[in-house]
Amino acid sequence: MIIGVLSVQGGFVEHMRSIERLGHEARAVRRAEQLEGLDGLIMPGGESTTMSKLLELGGMLEPLRELIADGLPVFGTCAGLILLADRVLDTRSDAHSLHAMDITVRRNAFGRQVDSFETQLPFGDIDTPVEAVFIRAPKVEEVGDGVEVVSTLPDGTVVGVRQGNVLGCSFHPELSEDDRVHEYFLRMVKQRGVE
């Protein structure tokens, strides 16, 4: 199984390490031609507006939209979640979205860098809570009918969503040694018949 990790900006190295710890090949994706032959793609955290501009400059927005529409499993964390959302609050007018999930997200909803926190949360069908690191994280304010909520904070704030082949979370699972959220994504990839 080959999992691409978008590597134009942000925390891509940690995601690659998680995939490799789980026994699969991780490929850094910086150009559109590197999207070919992938079984899945991770879009990491970073700065969402910067990432969207780099994707535009690199000619990757349309190829990504097409691959997602064709069913490529994609997992976005933090800024990656923002890029996947249909609607983004508190963003710049020149930011781009892939419009891959029927959700509304608010950028930096949990405050500034000093407001970062760690907690344990339920996630999908994982049997015990996962480690979740929140750094200037977005939150999901609205979900469409076809979106499954897979993780919430104790107060009900939505921080994990899935819509078909697209998975997203507000937090950074790659910053812990707990690889179970990545395993969850790999199970999505395997559901497409990929080993």
From Swiss-Prot:
Active site: residue positions: 78 (nucleophile), 172 (charge relay system), 174 (charge relay system)
Entry's EC annotation: 4.3.3.6, 3.5.1.2
Binding site for L-glutamine: 46-48, 107, 135-136
InterPro entries recorded: Class_I_gatase-like (IPR029062), PdxT/SNO (IPR002161)
UniProt key word Lyase: yes
UniProt-listed CDD domains: GATase1_PB
Reaction equation(s) it catalyzes: aldehydo-D-ribose 5-phosphate + D-glyceraldehyde 3-phosphate + L-glutamine = pyridoxal 5'-phosphate + L-glutamate + phosphate + 3 H2O + H(+); L-glutamine + H2O = L-glutamate + NH4(+)
Keywords (A to Z) from UniProt: Glutamine amidotransferase, Hydrolase, Lyase, Pyridoxal phosphate
Example of a GO cellular component annotation carried by this entry: glutaminase complex
A GO MF term: pyridoxal 5'-phosphate synthase (glutamine hydrolysing) activity
Pathway stated in the Swiss-Prot or TrEMBL entry: Cofactor biosynthesis; pyridoxal 5'-phosphate biosynthesis
Keyword DNA-binding: no
Pfam families given in the database record: SNO (PF01174)
Listed GO biological process terms: glutamine catabolic process; pyridoxal phosphate biosynthetic process; pyridoxine metabolic process
Function according to Swiss-Prot or TrEMBL: Catalyzes the hydrolysis of glutamine to glutamate and ammonia as part of the biosynthesis of pyridoxal 5'-phosphate. The resulting ammonia molecule is channeled to the active site of PdxS.
Family membership noted in the UniProt record: Belongs to the glutaminase PdxT/SNO family.
NCBIfam families per the UniProt record, alphabetical: PLP_synth_Pdx2
Subunit structure as annotated in this protein's UniProt entry: In the presence of PdxS, forms a dodecamer of heterodimers. Only shows activity in the heterodimer.
Name used for this protein in its record: Pyridoxal 5'-phosphate synthase subunit PdxT
Gene: pdxT
